[in-house]
């Protein structure tokens, strides 16, 4: 809701209140999600911002907070219990379910016990990837009920195929609530459908409410309208499919949409490399299998973090960077983003398992320090800083400090919203996707479709056409012709090139706390000079030598390709 409202420039705070109002009138409580230390974002949040989060959302009409820590570190969850109670909300604390030698029934029951003792009002069994084994899940629920007869809610995704059996098992063990979905967003990477779950539980002897089919069909129709408008442009048709291949890597359904979108960019990067070296191209399916295999390799070596936001993205991104590196003749672990290092080093919480020696050795070689204290201590309060910034910019803090909260939680996105850039970029992206959809070819046509690539030959770029299958040479003339591509204007400034190691978006800073580098500024070897954001992770680009920045060759927010010149240093 935040992202869409901000990008469209809508008055999101009014939308949230209007959304919760009819639920309250019908006696239905509303939920929100809280990533504990990470709040609503992919990186840690100061304690004062976390506390304001609860105050704002309760004022907007939210009743229950579902808090989870992607590492299952109760130290990150317990503060949210207090924030919820102070705000007058119900605290539902989550157990992030995964399947490993560490994540046993006893592990989860003990975690629930700690949360209940800390004051949790409810427990959520968050089976985010749908890979929890049905019988084990039933045992977890039964074990928790022995501690205290506390409300338990089961959340799962249908993709791997365990979902319906798991729902039956947890209900037989005493689960009170089940998360369900509705067509056309149920099944696949979503929840099991309401109609199917209701029919199954009714047959099993449970007392379940009847479904108002007229209302169901109306809501289903509204969802389809949203998808036909523009929402469907961001949802891969493959998300509807069941896929038992998801059992091994354990990646959650919630990130499969972004994964498939990222995969297209990653595949393009790999095949550009292969085209320059006259190597066979890789298919998307081949890359997907390599990624799944690499996730299975990486996951235990970085301590078995439960694969839920943001750590599912971290593990997936690390695996993808390894795959891309190895496909390009490089070694594993060559590029690890700072956020991923924070997870590895313990700054985001305690990892469930042990790190592999190769990871520890790399950290020591790079002079990185491990941390075993309270993760929140690494992130001091910042609300006063944002209050001052809003005052300087003459921005209203909003009703119940809503605007202040959004700025402190999402500084870059908020500034893009205020400038109008977010809306402009969003509408341009929707237009582009609609055009691509309108021009989409059939599968048979796509198989024989030609691709135009830019190939570098002895420093000179040439546009060439790569054809698949039997293609009439006459059709290639316009596209290829051995005419050099028009070279980009040479960037101002002298010195050595700082090249982008991957495709993504260029940023000088990743948050408002950092000061952007400028032309003329001196830098030392190892200094962070900019970032390339890819796959929801900011990858720090460091100076490889001492010197002075003579040129910055991209603007913040620009899309850059691998080997694009980002800066020049002399």
Each model region followed by its residue ranges:
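Active-site loops and adjacent core secondary-structure elements that bind or stabilize anionic groups
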Residues: 11, 258, 262, 281, ...
């Amino acid at each position: 809701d935040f992202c869409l409202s901000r990008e469209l420039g809508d008055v999101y705070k009014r939308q949230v209140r209007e959304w919760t109002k009819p639920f309250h009138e019908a006696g239905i409580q509303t939920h929100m999600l809280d990533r504990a230390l990470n709040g609503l974002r992919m990186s840690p949040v100061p304690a004062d911002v976390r506390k304001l989060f609860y105050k704002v959302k309760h004022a907007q009409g939210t009743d229950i907070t579902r808090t989870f820590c992607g590492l299952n570190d109760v130290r990150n969850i317990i503060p949210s219990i207090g924030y919820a109670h102070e705000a007058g909300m119900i605290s539902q604390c989550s157990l992030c379910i995964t399947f490993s030698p560490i994540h046993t029934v006893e592990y989860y029951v003990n975690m629930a016990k700690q949360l209940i003792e800390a004051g949790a009002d409810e427990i959520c069994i968050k089976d985010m990837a749908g890979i929890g084994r049905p019988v084990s899940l039933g045992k977890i629920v039964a074990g928790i009920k022995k501690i205290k007869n506390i409300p338990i809610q089961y959340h799962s995704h249908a993709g791997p195929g365990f979902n319906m059996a798991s729902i039956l098992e947890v209900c037989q063990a005493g689960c009170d609530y089940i998360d369900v979905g509705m067509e056309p967003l149920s099944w696949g990477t979503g929840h099991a459908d309401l109609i199917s779950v209701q029919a199954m539980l009714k047959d099993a002897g449970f007392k379940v409410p009847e479904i108002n089919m007229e209302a169901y069909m109306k809501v289903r129709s509204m969802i389809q309208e949203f998808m036909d408008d523009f929402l469907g442009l961001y949802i891969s048709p493959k998300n509807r499919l069941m896929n038992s291949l998801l059992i091994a890597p354990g990646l959650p359904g919630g990130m499969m949409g972004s994964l498939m979108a990222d995969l297209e960019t990653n595949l393009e990067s790999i095949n550009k490399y292969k085209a320059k070296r006259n190597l066979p191209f890789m298919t998307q399916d081949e890359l997907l299998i390599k990624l799944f295999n690499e996730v299975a390799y990486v996951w235990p070596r970085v301590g078995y973090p439960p694969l839920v936001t943001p750590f599912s993205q971290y593990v997936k991104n690390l695996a993808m960077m390894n795959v891309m590196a190895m496909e390009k003749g490089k070694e594993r672990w060559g590029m690890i983003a700072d956020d991923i290092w924070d997870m590895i080093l313990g700054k985001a919480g305690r990892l469930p398992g042990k790190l592999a020696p190769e990871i520890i050795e790399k950290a020591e070689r790079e002079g990185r320090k491990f941390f075993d204290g309270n993760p929140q201590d690494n992130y001091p309060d910042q609300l006063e800083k944002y209050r001052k910034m809003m005052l300087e910019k003459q921005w209203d803090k909003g009703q119940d400090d809503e605007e202040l909260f959004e700025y402190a939680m999402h500084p870059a996105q908020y500034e893009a919203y205020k400038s109008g850039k977010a809306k402009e970029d969003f509408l341009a992206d929707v237009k582009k996707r609609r055009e691509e959809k309108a021009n989409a070819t059939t599968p048979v046509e796509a198989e024989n479709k030609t691709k135009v690539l830019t190939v570098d030959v002895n420093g000179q770029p040439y546009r060439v056409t790569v054809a698949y299958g039997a293609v009439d040479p006459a059709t290639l003339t316009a596209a290829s012709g051995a005419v050099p591509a028009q070279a980009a204007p040479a960037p101002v400034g002298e010195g050595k090139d700082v090249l982008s190691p991957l495709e993504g978006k260029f940023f000088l800073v990743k948050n408002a706390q950092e000061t952007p580098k400028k032309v003329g500024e001196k830098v030392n070897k190892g200094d962070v000079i900019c970032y390339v954001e890819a796959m929801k992770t900011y990858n720090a680009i460091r100076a490889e030598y001492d010197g002075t920045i003579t040129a910055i060759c991209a603007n913040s927010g620009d899309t850059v390709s691998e080997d694009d010149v980002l800066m020049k240093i002399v």
